[in-house]
Every structure is written in structure tokens, then in C-alpha cells.
Amino acid sequence: MATVNKNLSDYDKNSIPNAKDFRFGIVVSEWNDSITEGLYRGAIEALLENQVPAQHIIRWNVPGSFELIYGSKKMLQTQNVDAVIAIGCVIQGQTKHFDFVCEGVTQGIKDLNVQTDIPVIFCVLTDNTMQQSIDRSGGIHGNKGTEAAIAAIKMAYIRQQASLSHQIDNQHLLSAGAIQLEEGSPLELKE
């Protein structure tokens, strides 16, 4: 999709679920920090604007974009978060290093989404020039950090709704006698 002269960070605030009870982790690459800090500011502003309390936001820094995978994994394992936003920036250079890092980070974040039950939002700019990154981190094309924060809220909400739906399905099966619990089972009917 062409994005020339379009600000992609505009969104309908009425379409955003209530986020006041969600907790978010943000893992930020220190490489290209003039860009990643802009993305972080966009994410923080969007989360706060959508009623996420500041104390429900945890930030960790990692050295580079490739380390976002490990940082996000550890955030998922050790912090009680509803979603993680991985923020990074890789800019094309003279070697294939760009391709390897972009592919590795993309696959790593994808793997975390497949292997865990907590969404990890990909907010890694993979641009050909510094100007393209500037344009997407608070410039003429908006702020991908803002978009990532909105995606994180929506995905946390989907996760919450799926969990509630699963609980209701189990309760329905129990009440219908379709499944039976052994004594001491962790699944209980809530009235």
C-alpha cells in the first residue's frame, strides 16, 4: 500500500477498547535511538491518551533490533503484561547485514506470537534511508509507535475476550454435563 503524503497514525478513538486495566511492556532498541525514541514517544502518548496508567507501562532497553527478540521473550516470561511492543529501526547500508537483521527480527517476533499467549507487536522500521525513518517516527507519515500502541491495545483486548469466551465455553460444557471434573481440578464454575 502506498503511503506517500498520508499520515498513518490517525485513528478513530471511539474504536479503541477500554485499556485502563491492561499492562504493557515496551522493549526499545538503543540502535538508531534518534528514531526509536520518537517511536517510543508515539507509543507512550497513545497508551496514556487511551487511559493506560503510567504505572502499567514497563520499558526495557536492548542494544539493537536483533536483541528485541530476547528482550521481548524475557519481558513475556517475567512481567505480568497483556502485550509487548518491540521498537526498533534498521536502515539499509552497503552490505547484506540489513537483510539478515530484518529477516531475523521479523521471524523472531513472529515466533514469539506463535509460541506464547501474549501478543508481541512488531514496531521495527526497516527503511532504505534515515529520512524514511524520520518520516515514520513522528514525521510526515505519522508515528509507527502510535500505531503499534493502538495495535497492542486491540490485541490485549482480543486476548482478554478469547480468555473470557474460553471460560464461558467451559462453564457451558460443565453445566450441560458434557465434561466432568475430577476432585481438586483447577477449573471451577463461577456464579
Positions of the model-derived regions?
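Short, ordered loop/turn segments at secondary-structure junctions
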Residues: 30-31, 89-90, 125-129
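Glycine-rich phosphate/diphosphate-binding loop of Rossmann-like nucleotide-binding domains
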Residues: 12-62
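Structural motif
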Residues: 25, 58, 67, 82-84, ...
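Glycine/charged-rich beta-loop-alpha catalytic/anionic-binding loops adjacent to active sites
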Residues: 24, 54-56, 90-94, 130-136
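C-terminal binding/interaction regions
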Residues: 2-5, 98-99, 103-191
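Electropositive phosphate-/nucleotide-binding environments in soluble metabolic enzymes
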Residues: 33, 37, 41, 62-66, ...
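N-terminal charged helix/coil linker that caps or initiates catalytic domains
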Residues: 6-11
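Glycine-rich phosphate-binding loop
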Residues: 67-109, 113
